[in-house]
Curated annotation (Swiss-Prot):
E.C. number: 2.1.1.14
Pathway participation: Amino-acid biosynthesis; L-methionine biosynthesis via de novo pathway; L-methionine from L-homocysteine (MetE route): step 1/1
Listed CDD domains: CIMS_C_terminal_like, CIMS_N_terminal_like
InterPro entries linked to this entry: Cbl-indep_Met_Synth_N, Cobalamin-indep_Met_synthase, Met_Synth_C/arc, UROD/MetE-like_sf
Binding locations of Zn(2+): 650, 652, 674, 735
Chain residues that bind L-homocysteine: 440-442, 493, 608
Protein species of origin: Burkholderia cenocepacia (strain ATCC BAA-245 / DSM 16553 / LMG 16656 / NCTC 13227 / J2315 / CF5610)
Protein name: 5-methyltetrahydropteroyltriglutamate--homocysteine methyltransferase
Active site: 703 (proton donor)
Lineage of producing organism: Bacteria, Pseudomonadati, Pseudomonadota, Betaproteobacteria, Burkholderiales
Cofactor note: Binds 1 zinc ion per subunit.
Amino acid sequence: MVTTHNLGFPRIGAKRELKFGLERYWKGESSRDELKALGAELRRRHWHDQRDLDLAPIGDFAFYDQVLDMSFTLGNLPKRVQDFHGDALDNAFRVARGRSAQSAEAHAACCGGVAAGEMTKWFDTNYHYIVPEFHADTNFSLDPSRLLQQLAEANAQGVNAKPVILGPVTYLWLGKAKDDSDRLALLPKLLPVYGALLDTLTAQGVEWVQIDEPILVTELDAEWRQAFRTAYAALETRRINLLLATYFGQLQDNLTLAASLPVDGLHIDAINARDEVDALVRELPPERVLSIGAINGRNIWKTDLNATLDWLEPLAKQLGDRLWLAPSCSLLHVPVDLANEAKLDAEIRSWLAFALQKLDELKVLATALNEGRDTVADALAANAAAIESRRRSPRVNNPAVKAAIARIDARLGNRASPYAQRASKQSARLNLPAFPTTTIGSFPQTAEIRQARSRFKAGTLDEAGYRTAMQAEIERSVREQESLELDVLVHGEAERNDMVEYFGEQLDGYAFSQFGWVQSYGSRCVKPPILFGDISRPKAMTVEWITYAQSLTNKPMKGMLTGPVTILNWSFVRDDQPRSVSCYQLALAIRDEVLDLEQAGVRVIQIDEAALREGLPLRRAQWSEYLKWAVESFRITANGVQDDTQIHTHMCYSEFNDIIASIADMDADVITIETSRSDMELLDAFDDFKYPNEIGPGVYDIHSPNIPTQDHIVGLMRKAAERIPAERLWVNPDCGLKTRQWGEVIPALTNMVAAAKTLRNQVR
């Protein structure tokens, strides 16, 4: 019999209940007990949703981040919070979000100032984790209370629970040594704590533990490979079954290593690594379980169940009870329930599967394998009809778009002149001071903005009323920026619910869910648009708002666009053509918008590529192909403008050392980047590579409520000036200010502008 299980379930709730609960707590509008009760209710509901599985995950739920939770389980708290002895949940929030010494937040609880932990992308997804911090003298100690509480809840509910933990080697790999010590030197101290955790779970009657080691799909040197052998030899003696889980890619040169580790089962992502399954069947010892991730855990298209069964049936005969079925990875990366999407186009809806529907697909596959296809004939027939409907739909294929793609040539992506000539013309046109100040684009999305948007979508506010409300918010943003004496202004993006969804709503080839939310980090959720067909732009998308904002000021107003690579990487993308083709389609559509903005007199246009690095394949050998079409797409978008139009781009959570040449090849006049959480470490890339254009290193962390001091910003910019000539430096936050409050934004920007003025005086 085939065993079904799940690697993880979305934690936010079908209607973002966790997000709203967290924000109420952080604002002091609810108690800690109420927040914990909400978490317990969500877990109860989610285990009920997974009741048909043979094994359901526990430990996948986290109030903020599962990697942060693992740090607390292992007793690895950053030194700056080790002296706080309050509730563990509040301590976790301190690490994740930071606390300013003057924090107005309830529950800041006399903490004094605490810097937020560094946050970065979870592999090549749009989820973010809090980076574990290590020092040479780091010690570990077990705190299993979180897992044991969830296990007790699951047992009381009758759940056949499978705890999910992050493996020791991946945990070290994901972290950062704050003193430049060797992370792997900590492995001997870490392994006994893992062993004690497994012993604790064994004592509670747990039979299987899922231990996630996704770095096995990356390129590992000999030292890291040996760490796997060392770690699992040490854990082999525990009297508990270990399912080693890999996902997000192929094992490739790590396949033999993974198959040889002394564990009881191995999970493989068969969406990305189907070609490796036969080799694993040959190499795995005959008693070992092979878990096949046959359902795509990262995208929302229905699985072709009949084709999947054609592939699985011979494996089931060969493996028998050793065959397990699961999604390819945790379902954290997809929305919860398609059944809530009453407003979604019926035809497109028939092509989709969210988390609950993916579990239904899993059940159909397992039933067909265990009892025969006849027992699920109706479900298989309905699935086949949906697959064929999508394949044949004229809404998916647009001949005019395909013809435009065929006409793309290299000249389309070239500026008329090199940067040095452009910079001279832009300087004359813009007349900016040294260390010019700007923001990344968005300002706080206030309750009034959200209410107006909600009323407009509900039909209780007409278009004229909505436009008036948004213009009032834009004017407020402009006046605040003028008062702060910023140099290049933005309109604040009041009219935008999301930097990707806003554009997708206005492009043909996109569809939109109502409740298709996924977690990005903490309480931050995004609702990726659904790229289902060929992309085109029917009309201008931003010109009206930007030209209105420019009419309110004599200072330069940035046109704000999201770039094609980021729109692609932050969408649920069609899987019936190469991603590069979809990206080129987006590039042509956004290029039309760039040219319309320039025609309307906009002098500075920012094309955000926040997710450029996120799309990199996990293996470097595949980077060049991705970077080629990603950079080409940006250049197609940006490079049709005149020399005196200044093109900006923004990237966040990115490390640049290994792709700096490609970033330079994008040829943006100004790039703004996230650097504050890493204390300008990201600028190390510029020690050896002389970046030719202008750059704005982010000088304060917008993800934290902390208010940066003027001296702190000056210090960061001095570090930046050691690597980048002062005349090519900008001063800006590290990301948009949408999620902050005006009461935080104004003092932070006041200090930022004051710092820029100090710097100008120092370089005179």
